[in-house]
Each structure stands twice: as structure tokens, then as C-alpha cells.
A protein has these predicted regions:
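N-terminal secretory signal peptides and thylakoid transit peptides that target proteins
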Residues: 1-15
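Active-site acidic/histidine proton-transfer and metal-coordination neighborhood
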Residues: 12, 16-23, 44-47, 64, ...
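C-terminal segment of N-terminal export signals and the immediately downstream linker at the start
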Residues: 21-41, 45-49
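Conserved, mostly hydrophobic/aromatic
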Residues: 33, 50, 81, 109, ...
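Catalytic domains of carbohydrate-active enzymes, especially glycoside hydrolases
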Residues: 46-61
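Gly/Pro-rich active-site loop or hairpin
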Residues: 47, 151-155, 179-236, 244-252
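Glycine-rich, proline-tolerant flexible connector loops at the mouths of alpha/beta enzymes
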Residues: 59-76
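C-terminal helical cap(s) of enzyme catalytic domains, especially alpha/beta-barrels
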Residues: 253-269
């Protein structure tokens, strides 16, 4: 039996979806910006650039909220993002090479109200990082950096070390670095399952070469297959564009990337 409450709920959902594209209506793929993409822009200009891309989610690099800021300055800087209507979904990448780094970065995250930390840690510090996660309640996502990274070239290199840790110790899958490490990126995501807490997306004309990055959709990255796998495993995190090229004028290429990804996300959401 359909109750009046059920009918009202269904009607409200129907009206809410009118006029919205499928990717936005379902938002099974939540697209955002890794602010490293905007590293040559000051904070106010970076905020405007994110808005120009038509997205609301942003992962903040320390270039836009410096580690050295006081708690009050961090709060004020964070408020600039909030006041612009942006949702801050994390911070990173953050290098954790010592116990001092761990203490500093988690305090930084607390003061800036970051809900997640993308990290590049030393493996022998993982137990201390896990304890910091438990104490603070702030999840961490280990970022892989491809063949140049002797510690975590691919997500699977980190996964084997954290598989028995607190579930809030997870991975930030960088799809470009993953393919350059010679891995099947879709399989890496599937194997990691719920440990995937964050993602950096980019595209490459040659999936093995770092210097071939192009706007997403212009290369060979299997974006549709990646999105389908994320939906299949009920990924609840964000897909943040890390646009590492054209640093002095990144917005046109970023817009082109988002246009493509929205179309793909819309198909996946059907």
C-alpha cells in the first residue's frame, strides 16, 4: 500500500529532478577539483577558477591554505571557500615523513576542518598514522605516484600494507600514475574496493608516459570503465581532477575535462 507520505516523497523527488542532467540528478560520480591544478593561482583566483568549472567540490592543496597559518588564519581561509559555496572534501597531497609531520598535519587538518587527508607516507609510519586517524576521526588516503615512486607506485602497493588496518586508512587512486605503473586501473580500483576513499583523475595520450597529459577525454584513459567500476562498488568519495598541465592558464582545459566527464557520468547514471 502506498501511503500519502510515500506519494509526497516520490512527488518531491520527481520535481527535484526536473531539468537536471542525469549526472547531477543521481550524482553517482561526484566530480571535484584537486586544487593543485590551480597551484599558480592565489587563493581568491583559485576559488573563482573552481566555480568557473561548474563544480562545488574541492580538495585543497597547502599552496592555498598554508601549513604555517595560525588556527585563526586557517579558519578564515577555509571560510573563503565556504562563503563561495564550495564544499571542501579534503586536503592534499600531504607528505608524512616523520612523527612530527603526522602531528603537524593532523593538527592542520583539525584547524582547517578537513574531512580527509590525502597523504604520501613512509611505510614504517603507518601504525602511527593509523593511531592518529583513530584519535582524530580524520580518514587518510594514500596517494600512489607511479614508477618514480619507490614506495607506492600503484594503489596495490599500499593496499597490501593497510588491508588489516582501520577502514579509515585507505587509498587515493591516481589513475594516471596507476597506468604508468603498468597496472590495469579498473582492476586496481576493484581490488581495493572500500579502501578507495579518494581519487585523482587525469588523462594521458600514452598511458605509460607522464609528459603526455591532455584534457580528460582527449587521451586513452578508460574513463567510462573507471566510472562504471566506481558505481558498481558504491564508491562514496569524490573524483577530483588533477590537471597538472598548463599551470598558468588551466581553466580552459579543466572546463573541457569536466564537460567530457559529465557526459560520461550521465551515461553511467542511466
Amino acid at each position: 500500500m502506498i501511503t500519502r507520505r510515500d506519494l509526497l516523497k516520490t512527488t518531491a523527488l520527481g520535481f527535484a529532478s526536473l531539468g537536471l542532467p542525469a549526472w547531477r540528478r543521481e550524482e553517482k560520480i561526484r566530480l571535484g577539483v584537486a586544487s593543485y591544478s590551480l597551484r599558480n593561482l592565489k587563493r581568491p583566483q583559485a576559488i573563482e577558477a573552481v566555480k568557473a568549472c561548474g563544480v562545488t567540490y574541492v580538495n585543497i592543496k597547502s599552496v592555498h591554505l598554508d601549513y604555517k597559518l595560525s588556527p585563526e588564519e586557517l579558519a578564515a581561509g577555509r571560510k573563503e571557500f565556504d562563503d563561495a559555496g564550495l564544499k571542501v572534501v579534503g586536503s592534499g597531497n600531504n607528505s608524512l615523513n616523520s612523527e612530527k609531520d603526522i602531528a603537524m598535519v593532523f593538527e592542520y587538518a583539525k584547524n582547517a576542518r578537513f574531512p580527509l587527508l590525502v597523504i604520501a607516507p613512509k611505510p614504517d609510519l603507518l601504525p602511527q598514522i593509523e593511531e592518529a586517524v583513530k584519535k582524530s576521526g580524520i580518514p587518510v588516503a594514500i596517494h600512489n605516484h607511479g614508477p618514480e615512486d619507490k614506495l607506492f607506485p600503484a594503489p596495490s602497493d599500499a593496499l597490501k600494507l593497510i588491508k588489516n588496518m582501520d577502514p579509515r586508512v585507505g587509498l587515493c587512486v591516481d589513475v594516471g600514475h596507476t597506468t604508468r605503473a603498468g597496472k590495469d586501473v579498473v582492476q586496481e580500483i576493484a581490488d581495493a574496493g572500500p579502501r578507495v576513499l579518494d581519487m585523482h583523475i587525469k588523462d594521458l595520450k600514452d598511458l605509460m608516459k607522464k609528459d603526455t597529459q591532455v584534457p580528460v577525454g582527449d587521451g586513452k584513459m578508460p574513463v567510462a570503465e573507471i566510472f562504471k567500476q566506481l558505481v558498481k562498488q558504491n564508491y562514496a568519495g569524490y573524483v577530483n581532477l588533477e590537471y597538472e598541465i598548463e599551470a598558468n592558464d588551466p581553466v580552459p582545459g579543466m572546463k573541457k575535462s569536466f564537460d567530457f566527464m559529465r557526459k560520461v557520468a550521465g551515461e553511467v547514471a542511466k
